[in-house]
A protein has these predicted regions:
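Arg/Lys-rich amphipathic alpha helix in sigma70-family domain 2
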Residues: 60-63, 74-94, 112
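Helix-turn-helix DNA-binding module
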Residues: 42, 124, 128-132, 137-157
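A short, charge-rich alpha-helical start-of-domain segment used by transcription regulators
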Residues: 2, 8-30
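Sigma70-family region 2
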Residues: 12-13, 49-67, 86-88, 99
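Internal acidic/polar
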Residues: 1-4, 89-112
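DNA-recognition helix of helix-turn-helix
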Residues: 77, 81, 151-175
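C-terminal edge and immediately downstream basic/flexible tail or linker adjoining helix-turn-helix-like DNA-binding
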Residues: 167-200
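Structural recognition of an alpha-helix C-terminal capping motif at a helix-to-coil junction
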Residues: 32, 46-53, 66-78
Length: 200
């Protein structure tokens, strides 16, 4: 299978249909990381679409094409944090009207195993800096170097934050299957790919 760099070079030469390969490769990673920040599956999917469109429009300026996955993850995190800030501002404007359904995302309603729900709740309750490092390193299996680059942290900070996240989650995570957390289903993958491919 061709590398990201080879695919990007062909896309830049006009083979736009190859962008679908990159999206399908990174969809699950982006969804999990987006969910760890925004905790709303519809909004996470919308952020993914925005991320893919922005990345496509800037492909020609990407110098390190072999680092596409890391670059894409940075775009997603920035967009997710921006949306999260907007949500906080909206909540402050509607002070006094507590959003009791905040944790009732469509994704959580669909999950039928108590273990998955327990894991998602535990991960979502982590402080943001620990949650991001945990999702990237343990669920997405991103390297320490990639995590350092995306989050602009030193190697020791990545390791310390991961260790603290594990300590906080130890009881809930013992013997679980992390890949089942924030599961990204095939129909959602197809929806995002089709949306972006129709826009480019």
């Amino acid at each position: 299978m061709p590398s990201d760099q080879e695919i990007i070079e062909r896309i830049i030469k006009g083979e736009n249909e190859l962008y679908e390969r990159l999206m399908r490769k990174y969809n699950e990673r982006l969804f999990r990381i987006g969910m760890s920040i925004i905790n709303d599956d519809a909004e996470a999917k919308d952020i993914m679409q925005t991320t893919y469109l922005n990345a496509f429009l800037k492909l020609h300026v990407l110098k390190n094409r072999s680092g596409f996955g890391t670059w894409l993850t940075k775009i997603l995190i920035n967009e997710s944090l921006l949306r999260k800030k907007k949500k906080v501002k909206q909540r402050l404007m509607l002070a006094g009207q507590a959003d009791k359904s905040e944790n009732e995302t469509p994704l959580k309603r669909l999950l039928n195993k108590e273990l998955k729900l327990l894991l998602e709740t535990a991960i979502a309750s982590l402080p943001e800096k620990y949650k991001l490092v945990f999702v990237m390193r343990e669920i997405e299996e991103m390297s320490v170097k990639e995590t350092m680059e995306v989050l602009k942290l030193s190697e020791s900070n990545v390791k310390i934050q991961l260790s603290r996240a594990k300590e906080m989650l130890r009881e809930n995570l013992t013997g679980t299957q992390l890949k089942e957390v924030f599961k990204f289903q095939r129909p959602a993958c197809d929806d995002i790919v089709n949306y972006v491919m129709n826009k480019i």
